[in-house]
Regions:
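Residues that define the loop-to-transmembrane-helix transition and helix capping
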Residues: 19-20, 59, 101, 169, ...
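Transmembrane helix segments
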Residues: 38-44, 162-205
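Alpha-helical transmembrane segments and their short interhelical loops
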Residues: 100-180, 225-247
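Membrane-interfacial helix-loop-helix junctions in multi-pass membrane proteins
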Residues: 14, 48-51, 183-241
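Aromatic- and glycine-rich beta-strand/loop motifs that create alpha-glucan
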Residues: 1-28
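Short, membrane-interfacial amphipathic segments enriched in basic
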Residues: 1-8, 154, 198-209
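Short cytosolic juxtamembrane segments of multi-pass membrane proteins
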Residues: 249-255
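Hydrophobic alpha-helical transmembrane segments of multi-pass membrane transport proteins
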Residues: 31-38, 55-129, 150, 158-159, ...
Length: 255
């Protein structure tokens, strides 16, 4: 456990030495939040949208931008892994008595802390713009937890790609190839029932869609604690499955 704590702070301090990466991963969702909420608000703030229970297009948009922030942070986690490989950091850790699990857990915990801050910033800006979480602090906690757990799963997959490829360009391309469709083929910008049938079909296989829908419900419609608890459980199981797969890839990469 002490090794995990040390590595967590090491990764956090490393992020602190390149603050532009953290700022950029938050700035892009914020730019999209402001741009889309202002550009499409008159188009989307219609009786039809409100008939679905959403208070405003801004409140509808915030959860999707929270997810976008953590997905980009997850991609950066994979790129950081490639950087550690290239600089020989993993070789140094490999010959140390630190377990492989502690090394990866330290990275995941650092990523999780970063994601919580980013999600809070996006939600805070959305609140300043007029959005409100109708389910209060408990709903806010549930929304942040779901989004962060999704980010942990995504970061584990990004690290898995990084360990397999050992190539920053390939990790970046693969990450973008997965991340952008995960956002656009989801209810992040418009309710699924307003979108083409093929998008609705693809969205059903998109884990980001379910997290975004939970967030949108907690923002505007109300809480369904049974559904929210199931979502948290599924994400926790997914994280527990993704982590061992990444550990196995790490063992193979440092064998």
């Amino acid at each position: 456990m002490p090794a995990t704590v040390v590595l967590t702070f090491r990764n956090l301090f490393k992020n602190g030495r390149t603050p532009m990466l953290v700022i950029a991963s938050v700035a892009q969702p914020l730019v999209w939040l402001v741009m889309f909420s202002q550009t499409f608000s008159r188009l989307a703030d219609t009786p039809l949208l409100r008939s679905l229970g959403y208070r405003s297009y801004l409140a509808f948009l915030v959860p999707g931008m929270m997810v976008l922030a953590v997905l980009f942070t997850a991609l950066q986690s994979g790129l950081a892994m490639v950087s550690d490989i290239d600089r020989g950091m993993l070789d140094k850790l490999r010959v140390s008595p630190i377990s492989r699990v502690s090394i990866l857990l330290g990275r995941v915990l650092a990523d999780s802390a970063t994601m919580v801050v980013q999600v809070a910033v996006v939600l805070g800006v959305g609140t300043l713009m007029g959005a409100r979480v109708e389910t209060g602090w408990l709903g806010t906690f549930g929304m942040v937890a779901c989004v962060t757990l999704l980010g942990v799963v995504w970061a584990s997959l990004a690290n898995l790609i990084a360990l397999r490829s050992r190539n920053a360009e390939l990790t970046m391309v693969a990450g973008i190839f997965v991340t952008l469709p995960a956002i656009f083929l989801s209810p992040a910008y418009f309710p699924l029932r307003f979108q083409p049938s093929w998008v609705q079909t693809v969205a059903k296989a998109n884990p980001a869609s379910y997290v975004i829908e939970v967030g949108q419900s907690l923002m505007s419609i109300g809480n369904d604690w049974g559904r929210d608890a199931r979502m948290l459980a599924v994400l926790a199981v997914a994280a527990l499955v993704a982590m061992p797969a990444t550990v196995a890839a790490f063992r193979a990469a440092t064998h």
